[in-house]
């Protein structure tokens, strides 16, 4: 896929965020509707997306292939956690800001942007592997995400029973054992889950509407974070996978592309829900998403 094809995909993402921004400025969306939309996404729509991604159990890779992809996932998240332990100390900032740095380094926008870009680059087969790589994201993001963003005092073990966590565990079992869901159920889950991307992008755009954009562009910390998130981490992952030979070339390339995605949109929803730094998180998402219009096509052209 050419640089300009991937570039076009990224412009679509930004257009939807701009629509959310405009809707907030015109009064169609407010802080209250943002909170309600956040709960709707985390409680119903995102779980449907997670379950729908493995609804066609007979077309997923074999159990052995899934376990092989999970090995790549261990390297993927291991690198993310390693960087999250070091980089925030260099960037500095308040405790909740450092929570944003850590979350941004560990969790990229693997599903909302990663799925369509992976399929566009590597074909429909890539979706199956991307789904498996995203499964640990769902478990880690919705369990550790509140802890990272809001601090240990805000963490409750009941969060492990959130709809997204439960859906992720079920999805992993469905994938490993190739359980076939009824076709109608799969269609319903996929249809409802398909609302995730536009609604999430509208939500982020609405959150950005009340923020001073100058801070995102003038903060050296955010620029350093964006460089690490979008360029350094993907290159480090590519070098490690190539050196160790973990995973097939296709799976390795998919993992690198997913690592090159901007900060996960889920961060805004989780920061709002659990009392994290919503402003800093939204700025991280905005700047990394904006910069990824250039960095993702560049990395894709090099693979």
Kindly label every feature range from the protein language model.
Residues 1-303:
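Alpha-helical transmembrane segments of multi-pass small-molecule/ion transporters
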